[in-house]
Amino acid sequence: MDYPLGGAYKAGWNLAQEFTNMYIGHGGEFFKPGSAEVSINNAKGVATLEMLKALSAYMNPDFLTHDSNATSAEWKAGNVAMMNMWGSRMGPLMDPEQSTPTVVKTTTLGDPMTVGGGSTPATTLWWDGWTVAKNISDAEAEATFIAMMNGINHKR
């Protein structure tokens, strides 16, 4: 197999998301402690860029054009053996009604990958959830949680 690794490295949002994933895996912090000052120009940021570059050596030379749709297509075509993909994209690949029998039979899921011998998953999922500030009282945190739960309740 010429290019065994697939990834959503399309220039722009996709590549930025992959940087974010890998940077978190390296234990990177986006801001200097106690401030809103961006802090990614550091050893962990460089290690992240070096890892992304190293992985690209195993990807299709057009990897900077591959978003999750193109990466899924590469998987379906049998052009890649491993990829880091969103869970929502894996369902169709494993569904006999949406994929081929060979793809369904040979597609499995694994634990989130780590990087550099660390134990922090090199992945993020920030768009389906919310956060509660840690510097508030338990009562305020509970009220925030209840308000958010009511906000997502489609029956209301």
Where are these regions (language model features)?
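Extracytoplasmic/periplasmic solute-binding protein
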Residues: 1-37, 44, 80
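Short beta-strand and adjacent tight-turn residues that come in two discontinuous sequence segments
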Residues: 7, 66, 84-86
